[in-house]
């Protein structure tokens, strides 16, 4: 059986990052955009853990900080989405114009 190497992890992380980036660029629903950002952050975590396999455990420690940041970003983002929905009754990015007078 073949060993799963670092390159395999990096390829999976690159695919996750590309899928997340395409989701952020193409979607108009705020919830889907937040999920795509979480996918990008998970790709970053996978890269950090893969490189910590080669260069020590610092990548794993930093990955924990990225997860904490992602949780805080999700909480704040969902709070903003709820505020948007209460004001405009939509979560579509194109229809939300709270900064316009």
Curated annotation (Swiss-Prot):
<keyword id="KW-0813">Transport</keyword>
<keyword id="KW-0812">Transmembrane</keyword>
<comment type="similarity">
    <text>Belongs to the complex I subunit 4L family.</text>
</comment>
<keyword id="KW-1133">Transmembrane helix</keyword>
<keyword id="KW-0874">Quinone</keyword>
<dbReference type="GO" id="GO:0042773">
    <property type="term" value="P:ATP synthesis coupled electron transport"/>
</dbReference>
<feature type="transmembrane region" description="Helical">
    <location>
        <begin position="31"/>
        <end position="51"/>
    </location>
</feature>
<keyword id="KW-1003">Cell membrane</keyword>
<feature type="transmembrane region" description="Helical">
    <location>
        <begin position="4"/>
        <end position="24"/>
    </location>
</feature>
<dbReference type="GO" id="GO:0048038">
    <property type="term" value="F:quinone binding"/>
</dbReference>
<dbReference type="InterPro" id="IPR039428">
    <property type="entry name" value="NUOK/Mnh_C1-like"/>
</dbReference>
<keyword id="KW-0830">Ubiquinone</keyword>
<dbReference type="GO" id="GO:0030964">
    <property type="term" value="C:NADH dehydrogenase complex"/>
</dbReference>
<keyword id="KW-0472">Membrane</keyword>
<dbReference type="InterPro" id="IPR001133">
    <property type="entry name" value="NADH_UbQ_OxRdtase_chain4L/K"/>
</dbReference>
<dbReference type="GO" id="GO:0050136">
    <property type="term" value="F:NADH:ubiquinone reductase (non-electrogenic) activity"/>
</dbReference>
<protein>
    <recommendedName>
        <fullName>NADH-quinone oxidoreductase subunit K 1</fullName>
        <ecNumber>7.1.1.-</ecNumber>
    </recommendedName>
</protein>
<keyword id="KW-0520">NAD</keyword>
<keyword id="KW-0997">Cell inner membrane</keyword>
<comment type="function">
    <text>NDH-1 shuttles electrons from NADH, via FMN and iron-sulfur (Fe-S) centers, to quinones in the respiratory chain. The immediate electron acceptor for the enzyme in this species is believed to be ubiquinone. Couples the redox reaction to proton translocation (for every two electrons transferred, four hydrogen ions are translocated across the cytoplasmic membrane), and thus conserves the redox energy in a proton gradient.</text>
</comment>
<comment type="subunit">
    <text>NDH-1 is composed of 14 different subunits. Subunits NuoA, H, J, K, L, M, N constitute the membrane sector of the complex.</text>
</comment>
<dbReference type="Pfam" id="PF00420">
    <property type="entry name" value="Oxidored_q2"/>
</dbReference>
<keyword id="KW-1278">Translocase</keyword>
<dbReference type="GO" id="GO:0005886">
    <property type="term" value="C:plasma membrane"/>
</dbReference>
<feature type="transmembrane region" description="Helical">
    <location>
        <begin position="64"/>
        <end position="84"/>
    </location>
</feature>
